[in-house]
Amino acid sequence: SQPHTKPSVFVMKNGTNVACLVKEFYPKDIRINLVSSKKITEFDPAIVISPSGKYNAVKLGKYEDSNSVTCSVQHDNKTVHSTDFEVKTDSTDHVKPKETENTKQPSKSCHKPKAIVHTEKVNMMSLTVLGLRMLFAKTVAVNFLLTAKLFFL
């Protein structure tokens, strides 16, 4: 059992895409709210456990005006509000934090993932694995029927 830990909450915006990143909290029970009057679509949050035993979560959404989006988190009967991160317009890949509610955060850097996974390849792999599973199941069934026939006839 761990001590209760208050989460750190960040909003990351890129065009119409918004991500609410919630880091290092315990216990797992949490409610993440992305608030905007111009919502296009919103996804359920994904929660993972870190090696330290604390939890991290992210909630994604698409909004007409990403600047109108705020993120608030309810954890342990307390509400935590976000710190905004906006992409700089210069040539570096660093992210510049925008200070809100007297919260100061050090500069963070975001790096794009090196491996790009295409949806078509993932779907094809899933179908291939499903096909192999079906072939295996048929093989086991035929083997069972032939074995049963041998013993009972």
Curated annotation (Swiss-Prot):
PANTHER family associated with the record: SIGNAL-REGULATORY PROTEIN BETA
UniProt source species: Homo sapiens (Human)
Disulfide-bonded cysteines: C20-C71
Keyword tags: Adaptive immunity, Cell membrane, Disulfide bond, Glycoprotein, Immunity, Membrane, Receptor, T cell receptor, Transmembrane, Transmembrane helix
Quaternary organization: Gamma-delta TR is a heterodimer composed of a gamma and delta chain; disulfide-linked. The gamma-delta TR is associated with the transmembrane signaling CD3 coreceptor proteins following the stoichiometry: a single gamma-delta TR heterodimer associates with one CD3D-CD3E heterodimer, one CD3G-CD3E heterodimer and one CD247 homodimer forming a stable octameric structure. Upon activation, gamma-delta TR complex associates with FCER1G to initiate intracellular signaling.
Gene behind the chain: TRDC
UniProt name for this protein: T cell receptor delta constant
Localization in the cell: Cell membrane
Transmembrane segments: 130-152
